[in-house]
Structure formats: C-alpha cells, structure tokens
C-alpha cells in the first residue's frame, strides 16, 4: 500500500519533492534533509499530502 506524498521545504521557499512511501511500515510523518535549490542549501523537508 504505497501512497504518494509531497516533501515540502521548511525554508519557506515553496519548493517541494514528490515521492512515495509504504504506509504500513512507516505510519508516522517523514522528515528528510534534502537540497533546496532556491536557497542553495540542505534543509529539512517535511511530509505533506498531495492535493
């Protein structure tokens, strides 16, 4: 049961990545440090629903 999710930048730039995750193995929200090209730094990306 893989579900599409959106990883939104915590820097407030509006940049996001889309990915999928297995809801059964990881039921809690994901927080990953990824590169934000708008601010040119690695920042924390938090999971959000795809609208």
From Swiss-Prot:
Protein name in UniProt: Large ribosomal subunit protein bL33
The gene coding this protein: rpmG
Cross-referenced PROSITE patterns: RIBOSOMAL_L33
Lineage of origin: Bacteria, Pseudomonadati, Pseudomonadota, Gammaproteobacteria, Pseudomonadales
One GO CC annotation: cytosolic large ribosomal subunit
Matches recorded under InterPro entries: Ribosomal_bL33 (IPR001705), Ribosomal_bL33_CS (IPR018264), Ribosomal_bL33_sf (IPR038584), Ribosomal_zn-bd (IPR011332)
Keyword Ribosomal protein: yes
Single Gene Ontology MF annotation: structural constituent of ribosome
Similarity section: Belongs to the bacterial ribosomal protein bL33 family.
SUPFAM superfamilies noted in UniProt: Zn-binding ribosomal proteins
GO biological process, one term: translation
Keywords: Ribonucleoprotein, Ribosomal protein
